[in-house]
Regions:
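N-terminal glycine-rich phosphate/adenylate-binding segment common to multiple enzyme folds
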Residues: 26, 94-111, 117-119, 202-219
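Short Gly/Thr/Asp-enriched flexible loops that form oxyanion-binding sites at enzyme active sites
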Residues: 118-132, 217-228
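Conserved phosphate- and dinucleotide-binding cores of soluble alpha/beta proteins
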Residues: 2-15, 20-33, 38-44, 50-57, ...
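General small-molecule cofactor/ligand-binding pocket signal
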Residues: 79-80, 140, 171
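Catalytic or ion-translocation cores adjacent to nucleophile or general acid/base/metal-coordination motifs
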Residues: 138-145
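HTH-adjacent hinge/linker in prokaryotic transcriptional regulators
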Residues: 2-5, 41-112, 123-135, 147-154
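A general structural motif
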Residues: 106-110, 134-136, 204, 261, ...
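Glycine-rich beta-strand-to-loop/alpha-helix junction loops that act as flexible
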Residues: 83, 112-118, 269, 293
């Protein structure tokens, strides 16, 4: 079929908005003033004529020596290593797919979700689909929402998208990650909504948290800490892995409840520093790690 230049440009724009600007199909429909089903058809058409090319990798194969070394060195239950792609963005998409496979393998009943790049991509991949045969009953956030516009830093939004796809019950926090004062934080903690999330935190089977370095402070206005080199699930750690106390104004799962969780997977993106990953691993905060192969290689080389 021969396509007019205008149609090719329109298909390319839809593909760009969806795959590169992280827009949902609903958001694209609003931008272009068309129906959401039409956006879906246009994305399929863009793939069929070669505007979009997607490569599929095995979701269960990781470079075994690296995975084993990570587990042996840091006492992990699993070290999930994803081969690097041609760009960080494509690598992060592959990591998001592997994260979804990991969640499926665990079959948890209660899941806690943080925020970040890979978690946001995983939530997006679930948009508009139904995931079969999952044991998940409830999904809740691990920490409050960032005040930036980017959806990848809004844990309540991730909870909504995961819950819709899995047929699970969402429990929202409806609170910022960092409140203006201790009085504001206490006000949130007294609400019925906060107590409903606490009830789920006590029953967590799986916690999904991204690992961040100091760049998270610039991106989200997150409350940084002196001597902290790594952050995960609302907690900061120094280079030796010592947990640092955050102000009482930070809205996140209490540490004692987090440590009672059966599995805690820490996700290290391609642009997160090795020092941040090391600090979280040394703290013993996570039971599993998901990382790009290049990051895992650097980490192993520093510990040998």
């Amino acid at each position: 079929m021969k396509y007019r230049k205008e149609k090719l440009e329109r298909l390319a724009r839809v593909a760009h908005l969806y795959y590169e600007e992280d827009k949902t199909q609903g958001e694209i429909a609003e931008i272009l003033r068309v129906s959401r089903p039409l956006v879906s058809r246009m994305l399929n058409e863009a793939r069929s004529i070669g505007i979009v090319e997607i490569r599929v990798r095995s979701l269960t194969s990781e470079p075994e020596p690296l995975s084993e070394l990570l587990c042996q060195t840091y006492g992990l239950r699993s070290g999930i290593v994803v081969p690097d792609e041609e760009s960080e963005d494509v690598t992060h998409y592959a990591m998001a797919q592997r994260l979804l496979a990991y969640i499926y393998e665990q079959q948890p009943a209660v899941v806690g979700i943080g925020w970040g790049t890979v978690i946001g991509l995983a939530a997006k991949r679930l948009e508009g689909i139904q995931v079969p045969s999952l044991a998940i009953q409830t999904i809740c956030p691990l920490l409050g929402n960032s005040n930036v516009l980017s959806r990848q830093y809004h844990s309540d939004e991730h909870v909504r998208m995961f819950a819709e796809a899995c047929g699970a019950q969402p429990v929202f926090l409806h609170a910022p990650v960092y409140t203006a004062s201790e009085a504001d934080a206490n006000m949130f903690r007294e609400t019925a909504q906060y107590q409903a999330v606490v009830d789920q935190w006590k029953k967590l089977d799986l916690a999904v948290a991204e690992i961040h370095d100091d760049s998270i402070i610039q991106r989200t206005g997150y409350c940084g800490q002196v001597n902290a080199v790594g952050y995960a699930a609302g907690y900061g750690m120094d280079a030796a892995g010592k947990m640092l106390s955050l102000p009482h104004t930070v809205m996140r799962i209490p540490l004692d409840m987090l440590k009672q969780c059966r599995r805690i997977i820490g996700i290290c993106t391609a642009d997160t520093s090795i020092q941040a990953l090391q600090s979280v691993l040394r703290a013993g905060l996570i039971t599993d790690v998901l990382a790009p192969e290049s990051v895992a290689q650097q980490l192993v080389s520093k510990t040998q």
